[in-house]
């Protein structure tokens, strides 16, 4: 998978770890008095590399040497695997540590440890991720994302909405998009023509795509041509109940938990690495309609969470088909 491309006091206790028996560790730096440091802004650093001694010390040194202070650090070293994952949040003075210098410092760190992934984000300075949303007839996830975006709860810029379902100018979605200057593209699809070339042309400048109940299977050729991450919402608790109508499948199976799954899109249907899952208990009193209603509520929150995790640099690949979510 392709994860965020943007490339990346002190922790005195972290320097004493010469051996680590932990699977995961979270620790926080000293708090800062914001009233005495009005110029400090927030940064995030994500790191994935082969595990060797001294990584935590070097990350701390990189930030502290520029006058920064780590507020929190999340570290994961899988048992019996020489792999290191970390996510650090820090504050710094942009007058003392300019954005380009920060990029170069973290690039040096990445080269030092032969990092597989090194990313840094400064939300106050960096442009937001650009996304396109693909949706079909059911619009509960699309509407929820648009409202969250309007309320400032999704740190993205929506370049366009693409749908294979026609929505007239008097629909609430069309009016919302028109009011906010977001283009709406209706591309009617068929079994023989999924309009993938046209979609590719519309989304070429995006950072990643979101499938908000887009009921079309994207081809392997599309995935390779786009070459970036695509986040999907599945209205079922994967890996169970793949494919169409998972709510009906789950209802017929008599499950006691209903769920929703947000995952990366791969060539295998509903089998990509999972980013987020949410569940709700149901009972014998639920009918199929209440089943679906509960599922839709889960889908909205699950998809929004996955997008937020991705934008906040919380997602890293782990093993062939898993993720680390900080």
How would you describe each model-predicted region?
Residues 52-72:
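Short amphipathic alpha-helix segments
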Residues 46-55, 96, 135:
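Short, surface-exposed ligand-recognition loops at beta-strand->loop->(often short) alpha-helix junctions
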Residues 30-38, 121-125:
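Flexible hinge/switch segments at interdomain interfaces of large molecular machines
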Residues 5, 17, 76-326:
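One-carbon transfer enzymes
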Residues 37-49:
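Short glycine-/aliphatic-rich beta-strand segments at the starts of folded cytosolic domains
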């Amino acid at each position: 998978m392709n994860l965020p491309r943007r490339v990346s006091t002190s922790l005195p206790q972290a320097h004493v770890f010469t051996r680590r028996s932990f699977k995961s560790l979270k620790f926080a730096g000293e708090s800062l008095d914001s009233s005495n440091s009005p110029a400090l802004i927030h940064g995030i650093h994500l790191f994935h590399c082969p595990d060797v001694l001294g990584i935590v010390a070097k990350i701390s040194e990189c930030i502290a040497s520029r006058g920064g202070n780590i507020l929190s650090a999340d570290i994961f070293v899988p048992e019996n695997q020489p792999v290191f994952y970390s996510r650090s949040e820090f504050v710094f003075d942009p007058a003392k540590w300019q954005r380009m210098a920060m990029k170069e410092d973290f690039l040096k760190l990445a080269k030092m440890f032969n990092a597989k992934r090194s990313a840094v984000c400064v939300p106050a300075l960096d442009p937001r991720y650009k996304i396109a949303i693909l949706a079909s007839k059911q619009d509960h996830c699309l509407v929820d994302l648009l409202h969250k975006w309007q309320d400032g709860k999704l740190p993205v810029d929506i370049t366009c909405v693409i749908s294979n379902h026609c929505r007239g100018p008097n629909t609430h979605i069309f009016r919302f998009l028109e009011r906010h200057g977001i283009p709406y593209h209706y591309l009617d699809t068929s079994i023989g023509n999924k309009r993938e070339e046209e979609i590719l042309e519309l989304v070429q400048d995006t950072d990643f795509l979101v499938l908000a109940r887009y009921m079309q299977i994207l081809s392997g050729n599309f995935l390779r041509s786009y070459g970036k991450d695509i986040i999907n919402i599945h209205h079922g608790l994967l890996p169970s109940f793949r494919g169409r109508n998972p709510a009906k499948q789950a209802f017929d199976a008599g499950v006691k938990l209903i769920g929703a799954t947000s995952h990366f899109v791969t060539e295998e249907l509903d089998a990509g690495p999972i980013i987020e899952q949410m569940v709700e208990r149901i009972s014998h009193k639920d009918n199929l309609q209440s089943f679906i209603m509960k599922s839709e509520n889960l889908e909205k929150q699950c998809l929004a969470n996955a997008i937020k995790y991705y934008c906040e640099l919380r997602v890293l690949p782990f093993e062939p088909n898993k993720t680390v979510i900080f």
